[in-house]
From Swiss-Prot:
Primary role: Catalyzes the attachment of serine to tRNA(Ser). Is also able to aminoacylate tRNA(Sec) with serine, to form the misacylated tRNA L-seryl-tRNA(Sec), which will be further converted into selenocysteinyl-tRNA(Sec).
Binding site for ATP: R271, S272, E273, E358, I359, S360, S361
Protein origin, superkingdom: Bacteria
Signal peptide (residue range): none
Transmembrane residue ranges: none
Name under which the protein is recorded: Serine--tRNA ligase
Domain notes: Consists of two distinct domains, a catalytic core and a N-terminal extension that is involved in tRNA binding.
Residues reported in the UniProt entry to bind L-serine: T240, A241, E242, E294, S393
Organism: Cupriavidus metallidurans (strain ATCC 43123 / DSM 2839 / NBRC 102507 / CH34)
Length: 435
């Protein structure tokens, strides 16, 4: 959530910056709400002050044994007016808060201006795509003989799910181990095991609610109501471990000397992909359920941009170890996620598509999430300040498996196991087709 003072001081400047990311701020609505809020706040405070003054006057008159009926009548009249004014003020403040929750983050000054993904800027390219001397197969055809099974998953659940069996299941697990070991042993992250179901407050804290509710899997649950009747409370399957990991610091004040915090977790992720109908319908690129190793950092504001560069490098390390060609791009203003102030996407080479596809997204959220969560830090006896939060995929496990199946495929249908994975797979050097 943006600092409302930015809008109060120079709403036109904020609107211009938001327009670069394709968001049209309703300036007139905000100004109308603000004008009414100011008027109601002044009116409410004046009524409260008048009531307090009259109450003192009544006390003094009664203490002297004098008639206080006049001031008492005025207090009685003020009560109803004050109640109505305070109630309307609360309604307006709620409307402003709801409006603020729908406004995306401001792009960092270093982010290139652009309308969509075609205007993202490549910052580096690592590795050279392999030249094949046989016809390239995509991961669906390669995996079909190795234990990658979409047909059974469709029968058991539906489309956009997968069964992994035997060698590919083992490789999937090995990838998780490599990623988590690298981030904990080499990059200084603390491994976390987190809930896969979170409450609405957590989703609001990281920015998934209210804007992206249609993309989430909702889990309604009966809870005891205050009147003894069951009420329904909505919980949600996590779309990314960013949600539980970042919410660790919700409503908390962290001692400055404990920062930065670095967390990493391997979890399944669940997304309805409501806006992705018809995209990547074949294979594992876009699934309703997929595994991801997620990195989260909580840092002081002045370390935010350096931490983003560092985290992006941490994600790139995995691809370097696996010797997979990739490129890193900085997203332009029009392609950034809702809560991000700056994002790098890392894209891995997919031979069958003859292109690079996203395998990691690393973002600084600035204080956008922290303001929603009231996540703060305190140096010594100083005033609490909002922290900055960052998150990044390190990596998407299924897409990494896809990249290996395609980049390491052999003419006989086998797949060479990358050297970095072999210790995690008992020394196996190849996945051989099933008999």
């Amino acid at each position: 959530m943006l600092d409302i003072q930015l809008l109060r001081k120079d709403i036109d400047a904020v609107a211009q910056r938001l327009a670069t990311r394709g968001f049209q701020l309703d300036v007139a609505l905000f100004q109308a709400l603000e004008a009414e809020r100011k008027q109601l706040q002044t009116q409410t405070e004046d009524l409260q002050a008048r009531r307090n003054s009259l109450s003192k006057q009544i006390g003094m008159l009664k203490g002297k044994g004098e008639d206080a009926s006049g001031p008492m009548a005025e207090v009685a009249g003020i009560g109803d007016t004050l109640k109505a004014s305070a109630q309307r003020l609360a309604e307006i403040q709620d409307q402003i808060s709801d409006a603020m929750l729908s406004i995306p983050n401001l792009p960092h000054e270093s982010v290139p201006t652009g309308k969509d993904e075609t205007e993202n800027v490549e910052v580096r390219r690592v590795g050279t795509p392999r030249t094949f001397d046989f016809e390239i197969k995509d991961h669906v055809d390669v995996g079909a003989r190795l234990g990658l099974d979409f047909e059974t998953a469709t029968k058991v659940t539906g489309s956009r799910f997968a069964f992994l069996r035997g060698g590919v299941a083992r490789m999937h697990r090995a990838l998780v181990q490599l990623m988590v070991d690298t981030h904990t042993l080499e990059h200084g992250y603390t491994e976390m095991y987190v809930p896969y179901i979170v409450n609405a407050a957590s989703m609001r804290g990281t920015g998934q609610l209210p804007k992206f509710e249609d993309d989430l899997f909702k889990v309604p649950r009966k809870v005891g109501g205050e009147d003894g009747q069951d009420a329904i409370e909505n919980f949600y399957l996590i779309p990314t471990a960013e949600v539980p990991l970042t919410n660790v610091v919700r409503d908390a004040i962290v001692a400055a000397e404990k920062l930065p915090l670095r967390f990493v977790a391997h979890t399944p992720c669940f997304r309805s992909e409501a806006g992705s109908y018809g995209k990547d319908t074949r294979g594992m690129i876009r699934q309703h359920q997929f595994d991801k190793v997620e990195m989260v950092q909580v840092v002081p504001s002045e370390q935010s941009m350096d931490a983003l560069e560092q985290m992006t490098g941490h994600a790139e390390t995995i691809l370097k170890k696996l010797e997979l060609p990739f490129r890193t791009v900085v997203l332009c203003t029009g392609d950034m996620g809702f809560g991000s102030t700056k994002t790098y996407d890392i894209e891995v080479w997919i031979p069958a598509q003859n292109t690079y596809r996203e395998i990691s997204s690393c973002s600084s959220m600035g204080d956008f999430q922290a303001r929603r969560m009231q996540a703060r830090m305190r140096a010594g006896q100083g005033k609490p300040e909002l922290v900055h939060t960052l998150n990044g995929s390190g990596l998407a496990v299924g897409r990494t498996l896809v990249a290996i199946l395609e980049n390491y495929q052999n003419a006989d249908g086998s797949v060479t196991v990358p050297k970095a994975l072999q210790p995690y797979m008992g020394g196996i050097t190849r996945l051989e087709p099933e008999a």
